[in-house]
């Protein structure tokens, strides 16, 4: 059994230490230890009270996810926690680090809670498709009130110690030795009273909420906005409703237990846990040893002060890394720094940042007009627009002025990293870092490995990704990398559906009902239809079939949100899309001119074609080795492209419906379009053998990766 609980006697106080490194989950051995050691302390007449702490730098991380679905060993969690809650002697939880999920639920079974200043508490189970199943939905509302408890549980965001003290979750904050402070706190309580509070008995805030319909209405609105399509949030709300309405604590616990089981058996739980582990696996590069030496990144530079450059600079500053923002246009530089300051001020205005914290991060950002100022930076990220010649020119300058061991990174969404590194004397230090806009908000970071990028550079950048709180995924250097290459197939099918008879609103609504954050035509309007149109006109290129409708709209000066009309119409100052029936003549004419007879198309066909277009291209990326593993592509699509987390990403989704069924649908679509719908050989092999994408790639199925001189043709 995993984990143990250590026992130490300090005078008349028993100190129990949960020891299950690195984060002390409530594994089977820990549960046995809690029962045994609490019995020992309660049976020792020399013990007056108990301090419960965690070993190392964590209190208790919560349930052991690796035990889910396994045969139960030892007592269940509820039995172990009852031993704490019904302890004859008062218990104080000494929280030394994170107390999340079952960790906080354990602490809520104690009579008192004291924590270090840097500790955090929270109930993040919703992020795994679950609800707090060890009493959290019943105990937390009794301390902070139902409304605040619902916000904590539905957001899944940890609460810092000071805020937790203000809310009443904590009774004290330790500024010295935590265990000694906990013992002193407990001695004081023992001297003051013989009645020590049990959270389960605190009903005042629940009674106050009875009959207040706003509490549940606000929670449902929050869940609908921030957790669209997810199952667990609704179950959390039902649990808190039971806490409010039930006079019997155990009846509320029974409700929580029943609804927890529903979440546990729901397919969303498996999908979201897949993403939880997938993000951790993505950080491991198969041929880069775990002990590879990394460079210290103590300072950074960013070339370009536009939206992307400013967002990247904020990432460094937020992590406490001084950053120089360079732009040789003084007005652009002033504007860019002004936007950064405005972004931070918005956070202050919304209560997400203190003025002192804002001043601190702004002090880490230094504007500059001179390349020489970047000389001592440990890393410089180029963040100018997508033009290979311009980027090569910048990298030549950086190679001349920045110290020789510094990493040079290009924020490119699809250009050849090897072509960029070729102009430097340090190709082993050059890497692609594809941030997603807005870079200070979007979590995804595609790290692009060039032919000569060293293992040390890769290990350093992957570590940096964690420091700046990104979901980092490595891609080989190939056209479109992972995300944008998969996107080609998705948008191609959306455009083909428009030619064949669907309307933008139908396509967008079908895909948003599936769970996508934004439909493809709303996204195209947001980005701007004129970007590709202008580029093609400038280069005198023929318009591809799939862009003919968008280009026809541009000829009518319908560019998207920027001028209030594109696939949709937009009211002044609003981003809300309204139907544009006047466009239908254009759709019909372009379709007829290109030999299409428009027809009725079902929502099911829309979803299948767009999503399976992603999946088939993903299979090709996997067989080429551009992505290391299928879960990496799921991480990319959930964190960068608005794919619903509760479906587990496109590759997991395909596995869940069965690759044999995926292949069957693709073959059916291929009857009308053999070029686009040629199934990946990897998909065919896996489908015919009952396999899943997690089984791939294997050496016998690997193919040569797409080269930059090749075109992705559909």
Question: Which positions does each model-derived feature cover?
Answer:
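Small cofactor-carrier domains centered on a conserved lysine used for covalent cofactor attachment
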Residues: 123
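N-terminal glycine-rich phosphate-binding loop for ADP-containing cofactors
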Residues: 2-3, 19, 71-75, 82, ...
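Active-site-proximal alpha-helical scaffold in enzymes
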Residues: 103-106, 110-112
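A broad structural signal for short, well-ordered beta-strand segments within beta-sheet-rich domains
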Residues: 5, 47, 60, 296-297
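A structural preference for short, pocket-lining loop segments at secondary-structure junctions
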Residues: 11-19, 29-71, 82-96, 116-120
């Amino acid at each position: 059994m995993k984990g143990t609980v250590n026992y130490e006697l300090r005078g008349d106080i028993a100190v129990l230490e949960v020891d299950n490194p690195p984060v002390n989950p409530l594994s089977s051995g820990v549960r046995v230890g809690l029962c045994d050691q609490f019995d020992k302390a309660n049976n020792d007449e020399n013990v007056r009270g108990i301090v419960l702490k965690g070993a190392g730098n964590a209190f208790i991380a919560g349930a052991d996810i690796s035990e889910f679905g396994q045969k139960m060993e030892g007592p269940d969690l509820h039995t172990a926690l009852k031993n704490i809650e019904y302890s004859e002697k008062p218990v104080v939880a000494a929280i030394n680090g994170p107390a999340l999920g079952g960790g906080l639920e354990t602490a809520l079974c104690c009579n008192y809670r004291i924590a270090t200043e840097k500790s955090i508490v929270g109930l993040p189970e919703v992020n795994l498709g679950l609800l707090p199943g060890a009493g959290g939905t019943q105990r937390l509302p009794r301390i902070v009130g139902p409304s605040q408890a619902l916000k904590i549980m539905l957001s899944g965001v940890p609460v810092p110690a000071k805020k937790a003290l203000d809310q009443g979750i904590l009774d004290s904050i330790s500024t010295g030795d935590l265990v000694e402070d906990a013992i002193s706190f407990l001695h004081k309580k023992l001297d003051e009273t013989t009645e020590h509070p049990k959270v389960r008995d605190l009903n005042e805030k629940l009674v106050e909420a009875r009959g207040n319909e706003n509490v549940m209405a606000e929670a449902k609105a929050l869940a609908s906005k921030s957790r669209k399509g997810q199952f667990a949030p609704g179950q959390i709300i039902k649990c808190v409703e039971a806490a409010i309405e039930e006079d019997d604590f155990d009846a509320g616990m029974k409700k929580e237990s029943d609804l927890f089981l529903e979440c546990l058996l729901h397919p969303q739980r498996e999908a979201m846990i897949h993403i939880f582990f997938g993000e951790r696996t993505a950080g491991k590069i198969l041929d880069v040893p775990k002990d590879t030496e990394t460079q210290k990144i103590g300072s950074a530079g960013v070339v370009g002060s536009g939206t992307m450059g400013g967002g990247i600079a904020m990432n460094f500053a937020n992590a406490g890394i001084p950053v120089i923002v360079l732009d040789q246009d003084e007005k652009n530089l002033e504007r860019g720094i002004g936007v950064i300051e405005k972004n931070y001020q918005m956070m202050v205005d919304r209560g997400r940042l203190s003025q002192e914290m804002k001043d601190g991060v702004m002090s880490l950002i230094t504007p500059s007009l001179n390349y020489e100022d970047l000389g001592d930076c440990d890393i410089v990220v180029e963040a100018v627009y997508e033009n290979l010649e311009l980027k090569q020119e910048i990298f030549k300058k950086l190679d001349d002025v920045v110290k020789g061991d510094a990493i040079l990174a290009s924020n490119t969404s699809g250009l050849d990293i090897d072509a960029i590194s070729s102009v430097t004397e340090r190709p082993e230090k050059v890497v692609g870092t594809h941030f997603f806009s807005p870079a200070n908000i979007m979590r995804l970071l595609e790290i692009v490995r060039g032919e000569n990028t060293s293992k040390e550079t890769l290990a350093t950048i992957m570590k940096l990704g964690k420091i700046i709180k990104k979901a980092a995924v490595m891609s080989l250097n190939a056209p479109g990398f992972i995300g944008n290459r998969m996107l080609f197939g998705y948008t191609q099918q959306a455009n083909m559906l428009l030619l064949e008879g669907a309307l933008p609103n139908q396509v967008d609504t079908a895909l948003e009902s599936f769970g996508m954050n934004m439909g493809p035509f709303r996204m195209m309007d947001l980005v701007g239809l004129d970007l590709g149109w202008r580029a093609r006109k400038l280069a005198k290129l023929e318009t591809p079939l799939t862009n003919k409708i968008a280009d026809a709209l541009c000829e009518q000066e319908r560019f998207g949100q920027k001028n209030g009309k594109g696939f949709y119409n937009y009211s002044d100052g609003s981003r809300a899309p309204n139907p544009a029936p006047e466009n239908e003549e254009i759709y019909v004419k372009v379709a007829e001119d290109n030999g299409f007879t428009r027809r009725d198309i079902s929502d099911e066909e829309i979803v299948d074609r767009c999503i399976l277009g992603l999946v088939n291209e993903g299979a090709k990326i996997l067989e080429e080795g551009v992505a290391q593993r299928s879960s990496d592509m799921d991480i990319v699509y959930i964190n960068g492209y608005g794919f619903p987390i509760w479906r587990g990403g496109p590759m997991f989704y395909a596995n869940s419906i069965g690759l044999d069924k995926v292949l069957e649908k693709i073959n059916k679509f291929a009857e009308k379009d053999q070029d686009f719908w040629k199934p990946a050989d990897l998909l065919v092999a896996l489908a015919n053998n009952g396999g899943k994408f997690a089984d791939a790639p294997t050496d016998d199925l690997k193919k040569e990766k797409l080269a930059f001189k090749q075109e992705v043709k559909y």
